[in-house]
Each structure stands twice: as structure tokens, then as C-alpha cells.
Regions:
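Short loop/turn segments immediately following the C-termini of beta-strands
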Residues: 46, 93, 143-144, 190, ...
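Conserved beta-propeller blade signature
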Residues: 40-43, 87-89, 137-140, 184-187, ...
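Short loop/turn segments that connect beta-strands within beta-propeller blades
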Residues: 55-59, 102-106, 152-156, 198-203, ...
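Beta-rich, blade/repeat-based domains predominating
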Residues: 26-36, 70-84, 116-134, 167-181, ...
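Blade-level signature of beta-propeller repeat domains, shared across WD40, Kelch, NHL, RCC1
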Residues: 253-281
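Beta-strand-rich domains and repeat architectures in extracellular enzymes and scaffolds
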Residues: 22-49
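Surface-exposed loop and turn segments in beta-propeller and other repeat-based domains
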Residues: 19-23, 62-72, 110-122, 159-169, ...
Length: 281
């Protein structure tokens, strides 16, 4: 798979240059960005322990959150997940929980499994990221054990994968988890510099190893690989590169913390202090 990607790179002719269309500089340490079923945008700012909400035109709507351990409060959260389309999940690792909010950023519930009566084989202490499948199945990256724990109804555990028992699918340092339109699961492993793919039962499928990979996104059945300089679009059904979208020289190799694909023409890139909209023209 690795060889296939690089062979396709060599035969591509000409990159498309992305153009920056809008910038929002209103963050202290923004780490994660997501969207919901209504195309609203949510930025997780770990520096202020807040979520900032924008509409699909990147117009400010509201913000919520502060440092603490109460309901709707955070302590350096690491990941925001709108994959259900209906609500928002925040990985609040230092508080050892996943918090669920509605689309107006009102608190709904928390999942905290680091408890004495919880099965040690099926609990997490520090959640790094999360994903929702089939409306209610919650998949959590357990950062302390480098694995994925599954909660079929969002609360009761049903299994794990990606641990030492997973063979080629063993994870070493998982940091991000996404899904495609077929509900296949993709995990970014920083230590392996790879995206590890599983089916929705947690069975290992394959691995994409990319030496300069920094982040990734998925829209439909297209994988977007980002190395800080360019976005490579990869067709998951054909296992081939579609094209490359390049940033201007002045914007390359900045410290980007996340990427979100709005359409094939519009991309959001997140930095510590800035959210920027990039357009393919």
C-alpha cells in the first residue's frame, strides 16, 4: 500500500494551489475542529477550555465552557467529535471522561469508566479521541493502553481492538479516529506514522504508512492526507491517489493541529491561534 501511494505521487502532473479565503484568529490553543449535521463548525480551544461555534459561513455563533470538573467544564480537552451529526462529544482526558453536549453546547451526559466497579479490561482513564457509529455506538481511543474501547449504546462496553492482541492492527500511539461512508474505521497512529484501517467490528484490514504524515480527514470515501505542505486526496475504493492540493510556500510547514474537509473545494486548517478557510480554484 505504501509503494502504491508513492508511485501515484510520481505520475501526477501539476498540483492545484489552494487559496486562503478567510481567517479567524480568536484562540489560545485550538487543537480540534469538527462539524455537525447542519454544517455548523465547532473549534475546541484547550487553552481556554472552551468550544467555539460558527455557522457554515464561519460567522461566530456562540462559545461555552471553562476550566473545571463540573458539567460542561473541561481541563485541557483534546478532541471534539460531531460524527453523529446530532450532538457533540468532547474528550476531556484530564477529567477522565467523555462529555456529550447538544448542538447548542448544553451539557447532556458524561461517560467516566475509571471506577472501582468497572471491568478493568473495558475501561479508559484518559480518552484521547472518540467516534460515533450507527447513531449510538461510541468508539474511544484509550490513550493509556493504546487501544480502542467500544460502547455499543454509548455507555455499556462491548469490546476492545487495536491492543496487543490485534496482531498487525496493534496501535502504538493512536491520536485520532474517523470513519468513511461504509463505516470503516481509520486511526491515526503518530508513532507508526500510519493510518490503520479496521472494519466496524474492529477487525484489522490494512495500513497506510506515510513518512511525513501529520494529520488526515475523511469525506465520503475519500481520504485526505495532510503533511503541512499539501493535501493528497486518496480514493479509498480504488486505492489510488486522485490529486494533490498545495499550500502557498509562505503557509507551508506551519504548526497545524487539525484539518476538516467541508467540500472537495473547501478546506479548514486549524492552528494553535487560527482557523483558516482554504479554497480550490
Amino acid at each position: 500500500m505504501l509503494l502504491l501511494i508513492f508511485l501515484n505521487f510520481f505520475i501526477l502532473r501539476g498540483d492545484t494551489l489552494l487559496t486562503k479565503e478567510k481567517t479567524i484568529s480568536d484562540f489560545q490553543n485550538a487543537l480540534s475542529v469538527t462539524t455537525d449535521g447542519k454544517e455548523n463548525i465547532y473549534v475546541l480551544d484547550a487553552g481556554t477550555n472552551q468550544i467555539v461555534k460558527f455557522n457554515n459561513k464561519l460567522e461566530y455563533k456562540k462559545r461555552n465552557g471553562k476550566q473545571g470538573w463540573g458539567e460542561g467544564q473541561f481541563d485541557y480537552p483534546t478532541f471534539i467529535d460531531g460524527s453523529s451529526g446530532l450532538d457533540i462529544f468532547v474528550s476531556d482526558g484530564k477529567n477522565h471522561r467523555i462529555q456529550r453536549l447538544d448542538l447548542e453546547l448544553n451539557y447532556i451526559s458524561s461517560l467516566k469508566t475509571d471506577l472501582p466497579d468497572f471491568n478493568v479490561e473495558l475501561k479508559f482513564r484518559t480518552p484521547a479521541a472518540s467516534l460515533i457509529l450507527n447513531s449510538s455506538e461510541l468508539y474511544v481511543i484509550d490513550a493509556d493502553n493504546n487501544r480502542i474501547v467500544v460502547y455499543k449504546d454509548g455507555r455499556n462496553p462491548s469490546g476492545v481492538f487495536g491492543d496487543y492482541k490485534s496482531g498487525k492492527g496493534q496501535l502504538i500511539h493512536p491520536v485520532k479516529i474517523l470513519k468513511d461512508s461504509r463505516n470503516f474505521i481509520y486511526v491515526l497512529d503518530k508513532e507508526q506514522k500510519a493510518i490503520v484501517r479496521f472494519d466496524n467490528l474492529g477487525n484489522y484490514l490494512n495500513k497506510l504508512e506515510i513518512s511525513d504524515l501529520e494529520n488526515f480527514a475523511i469525506r465520503g470515501n475519500t481520504l485526505y492526507l495532510f503533511n503541512g505542505k499539501e493535501i493528497t486526496r486518496y480514493d479509498l475504493e480504488r486505492s489510488s491517489v486522485i490529486d494533490k492540493l498545495s499550500l502557498p510556500e509562505s503557509s507551508r510547514k506551519k504548526k497545524y493541529t487539525d484539518i476538516l474537509v467541508l467540500t472537495d473545494e473547501k478546506y479548514l486548517l486549524l492552528k494553535k491561534n487560527e482557523l483558516s478557510l482554504w479554497v480550490k480554484k
